[in-house]
Every structure is written in structure tokens, then in C-alpha cells.
Amino acid sequence: MGKFEVLDHPLIQHKLTMIRDKNVGTKFFRETVKEISTLMAYEVARDMPLKDVEIETPIAKTTQKELAGKKVAIIPILRAGIGMVDGMTDLIPAAKIGFIGMYRDEETLKPHEYFVKLPNDITERQLFIVDPMLATGGSAMMAIEALKKRGCSEKNMKFACLVAAPEGVKAVRDAYPDVDIYTAGLDDHLNEDGYIVPGLGDAGDRLFGTK
């Protein structure tokens, strides 16, 4: 069973509170989402494997640690997921980037896939799927399914979001129990329009200043 973790680091919680405020502007929102994403990347990558390596410092030869195992690919769910990419690549600069495009039907609240572009070696990588919101879970599940259809394993997937609703967390964990889920905030519920309460509004609109 994959893990579900609410990242309670004080800086993450402080910055999340700031972007929940409806009065902050696009520039501040975008920059702070990037900062939160960097802090989240540190936590999401916590269990990456290490191996011993022999190096020589200016003083002596020594055995130290370096990353081992699968390299990382960051997969934002378009469009809002793009806002989390730069923060993560600040910490993992060698990560490859893939894209899965989704839009939500405002009447049915169902996601629709319109674009997929992934690295050629996607099946050989540890996947960090990113989207600021985990509401109904529909977009996350469709992204996971798109990756599985292309040969990726659930056990190599980690989903990271800024805010999650209990309904979305349950839906993803029921459907894909081996996928790890990380969120900065677990909120109360979804309203009748499918928005997370209290949430932070529409993350894509607030990131890009458009609707």
C-alpha cells in the first residue's frame, strides 16, 4: 500500500496559508507556489535510494553517498501543474519533464485528456506527478492511468499536490493503492461545484491570471 502524507513542515504550512488568502496577487501566488514545491520536493524525495561511492577530497580519499536507482521525471497535469515544476527542478535539476493535459467539464466535473508528451525512457524513471489540487481525484486518476497504459508501474509513481479533499484522496487510494500521495494541506470537503473547501480557489486561474 502506498503512503499518504500531509507535509506539516512549518515553512510549508506558513506559505500555504499565505496563498490561500484571496487578496494576494498573481506574482506572489506564483512565486510562493514555486517555493512550496521546492520544499515538497525535499519531502517527496526523502526515500530515494543511495549507494556508496569512492571519491577523493582535497584532503583524503573517502566513501560517501550518492543517489542510486531510478532517475526522476516530473509530470505536471496541465495547466496548473506547470506552476509546481520549477520549484521541483530547483532541487532535482536533472529531472526530465513530461506533460499530461487535462480539462474539467464544468457540468459533469469529469476530466478529459487532450495532450500527453512523455520522455522516451518514462518506464525507467521514478515519476513525480504534480497538480496543485486533488479535488474529486478524476484528473489524478486519469493521469495515473495514462502512465500505466504506457508501461509505467504504480509503485514508481508519487502524486504531489498543494491541497487535497478527503474525497479525492480516497478515490485515488481506492483505485491505485500503490501510488504515494503527498499534500501540503488536507481540507474539509468538496462543495457542490467540486471545489475544495476551504481550498485556495482555482489554482490555474491564480497562477496565470486568466480564466
Curated annotation (Swiss-Prot):
Give the required cofactors.
Answer: Mg(2+)
- On whether DNA-binding is a keyword of this UniProt record, the answer is no
* Pathway the protein takes part in: Pyrimidine metabolism; UMP biosynthesis via salvage pathway; UMP from uracil: step 1/1
Task: Write down the chemical reaction(s) this protein catalyses.
Answer: UMP + diphosphate = 5-phospho-alpha-D-ribose 1-diphosphate + uracil
Q: How is the cofactor bound?
A: Binds 1 Mg(2+) ion per subunit. The magnesium is bound as Mg-PRPP.
> Its family?
Belongs to the UPRTase family.
UniProt-listed Enzyme Commission number(s): 2.4.2.9
Residues annotated to bind uracil: 196, 201-203
What is the uppermost EC class here?
Answer: transferase
Q: Establish whether keyword Transferase is in the entry.
A: yes
- Activity control: Allosterically activated by GTP.
Q: Which UniProt keywords apply?
A: Allosteric enzyme, Glycosyltransferase, GTP-binding, Magnesium, Nucleotide-binding, Transferase
In terms of domain of life, where is this protein from? Answer: Bacteria
Q: What does this protein do?
A: Catalyzes the conversion of uracil and 5-phospho-alpha-D-ribose 1-diphosphate (PRPP) to UMP and diphosphate.
Question: Which GO BP terms apply?
Answer: UMP salvage; uracil salvage
GO molecular function: any one? GTP binding
InterPro entries with a match to the protein in the record: PRibTrfase_dom, PRTase-like, Upp_B, UPRTase/APRTase, Ura_phspho_trans
Specify the protein name.
Answer: Uracil phosphoribosyltransferase
